[in-house]
Amino acid sequence: MNQYQQDHGNAPEQVKGRFLVFVIILILMFAYLFAGLVNLQLKSSEGYSTKTESTRLKTIPLTGKRGNITDANSVILATDEMVYNVTFYKDASESSSSVYKTYTQSIIDTLKIIERNGGKLAFSYVIQRSEETGEWEFSFGSGVSDATLQTRESQWRSNNYVTAKSYPTPEDCLVTLKHRYRMVNSAEEEEEVRAAYIEKRGDDSGYVPCIIVDEDTMLKVMAVFSEMQMNLYNSLPITIAKNVPFETVTEIETKSMMLPGMDISESTQRVYPKQTLAAQVIGYIGKIPSRTMWLTLQAKGYSYNDTIGRDGIESSMEDWLTQNSSLRKGSRVVERNNWSKIVREISYTEPSDGNNVKLTLDVNYQTVAERAIASNVARIRDKQEDLMVSSKWLEDNRTLIATYDWEHYPLELAEHGVMLVLDMQARVLAMANYPTYDLNALVAGGDEARAILSDDRNLMLNYAIGSRATPGSIFKMVTGFGALDSGVLKPDEMISDMGYYTAYNSDLSTAPKCWISEGYRSQHYYQTIVEGLEHSCNYFFYECGSRLGETRLYQYAAAFGLTSKTGIDLPGEVRSVVGSQNTLYDPTKPVGESSQDTSRPIIVFNSIKSHLKKCGESRGMEYDDERLSSCAKRLMDMAVAYPESSWVENMRTILMEELNMPRSMVYSNSVITDTYNYINDIKWGGSQTILTAIGQSVTTVTPIAVARYVTAVANGGKVYNVSIVDSIISPEGEVLSRRDPVLINDLNDTNGYFNLIHKGMKGVTDDTGTAKRYWSDFKWQKKMGAKTGTAQVNQIDLENNGWFVCFAPLDNPKVAIVVYVPHGYSGAMCSYAAKDFLNWIFPEWDKSDVDYDLPIGNSLAP
């Protein structure tokens, strides 16, 4: 054995062993890699395949038809018709320049087809040129708060990846997005975009040339992309053109392979066959107005682009009518190719239609009522315009005309009107508003819709439920019945008009009196309740109101339903208010206008604060707003809680405690007198009670509340909630819900006092009543009861509010009618609409009352 072998042992064997170990390790490594490949290929391929499939499979929600709205006789007032829409879809993962260019060209080509066949894009872009400056500006809607506009802009920027920091102006956003979608407005701009690309990348490899388009086309294309971006989260197509003609459908489907992302879908469009009839009652549908509302509706299954009822029955009955809830939606699972075209349908679940809503309205009643109120308003307007230039009116109002502030208070003449017809269980048979509008125009959008929305007459307001006004003399049936029922007035008791009513005000320059001229006052002598109503004598009802007092008068008004909402199934009803201390100022509530029934408390509150602040400043004293507010509230509460005789003493105590006023100040007339006068404005007294008794003071009522009240007068004291929905019917015809009349109060007239009220109301259009000359030629003059109401708005009589209420037939009432015309000059002038309606309905009743002799056996009828 040589020295090497001694030192290293058997070297070849050692090398061989090491090589063997290396080979084994290498084999194990390859085995591990191979196993990984096998796992990837065999075990994970199913998962990756599923993931790939999920990007190609899309579930498209399907909706049926929105439910119909019909009148009481099943005449359709609102329905859905099937239409064709053009839709667009782009997968969110596709964002390369070449993809954008392909879709841009597809949008351009599709828009040409749509517009060539008379269609138009369903929306506009949120960036537009200002008409005043020509500069680019955002347009996120009008008539909403700044906070809402900011929220909309923020959401839009986020969805379109244009932050305010990087792209602060609308023009910055426009240019960036235009280039992103591969559009320019000129060849020069295209060169600039290319040059910028080369400067950034070093060469033009990979550069995708832009399409040269005009500005109008650019905005339309960007509008489509914008709408798609706002809709990306639900991965659904957007509708870019609605209700397109069949020519458009055919051309787009024929060119389907050349129009990536485009498709034709069947949808529904809301149609209102009667157009303007009962527009404010039916309402309309529209987009979900805010993201906040959509988040609420999303839980019910609504999609972002679904429509909802925005007003009227469409709104109040949304849950019944809608086809958009998850319970009624169907679905279609489809497979799309790389260009978002549907290549096959995987499954289909049929949607359900919404339910139908049957109203209590009768189309015939509604048609006659709408024509009647339109004619009446025009007639009043003509009368007012004639009076304005008549020598007598100008002479009678000469002093007032010379001193009136015409600039700040322009003359308001009749331009609106409401007419209501209810049956004896307060079911609405007609609810007519004038002027009205075409519901189809509003749903279609465009110039006609904008004209409706911007009309100064506020066409969409349902004045029957959404407006309040002083009722005037139509309130006198409350006072009269209350006086009789409470025993403060005997049925045969006579009250004579003695001129000025001085029980609460001995100053003849301001004391109230009847409307009749002094020379004719004898006509109002020796009046029972019957003549009091017939003549509408204010003095008579001052006395009745004084005897009743504030509390009982208010209680009877409440018993007739005049202090609460009517329960009608329509959105936007406001509550009537009747004069009382708590109506004038309720010390248990905050002073703010939203908490109180009138604006007077906040006016008094601010006046007291301003006065006391000035008093302090004149003496070098400053009061912070919190202390002034606390002091003003205490002073107002004190005025309600204590008699006037103790006001001054209590005022001084409050001023010293709240503001640390020295005795010299609180004993100063300059401090006390004005404060006293201010708090006196929110203190109820007898003078306010007697004004309430004739429908004045702070009493304001809605036409719908008046209609319920007149119905109760006509039917003998039964007060019902007002109903306008008769029933809910499924698409298959099953009655799901029936809205029966709900009796909320019965005045229990066991003494027959309503017979006296009816007799007095009969005399209004007969005998010597306030409207006799307007009804002298009416065939059924003795078969109705009525009451006029003229409520003063200001010193100009032309601006008076006019009311006319009636019921018929007198002996067996079937309908109660209310006519209200803001600035309608006089109640009697408002009677024309009721007269037109009754001239139509009495013959209809006569027809139905005819007894026909039926043939016997199998004989033929003559």
For each of these PLM feature ranges, what is it?
Residues A78, Y84, S130, V333-E350, ...:
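Beta-lactam-recognizing serine transpeptidase/beta-lactamase-like catalytic domain environment
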Residues P822-I841:
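Amphipathic oligomerization regions
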Residues M1-G354, K358, V363-V418, G545, ...:
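Membrane-proximal periplasmic segments of bacterial cell-envelope enzymes
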Residues E734-D740, K835-P862:
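Short, gly/Ser/Thr-rich active-site loops of penicillin-recognizing serine hydrolases
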Residues Q384-L394, E493-D497, T551, V850-L854:
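Short, glycine/acidic-rich hinge or "gate" loops at secondary-structure transitions
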Residues E94, G286-W294, V488-L489, N715-N721, ...:
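Short helix-capping/linker segments at secondary-structure and domain boundaries
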Residues S93, Q366, R468, H823-G824:
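Short strand->helix junction
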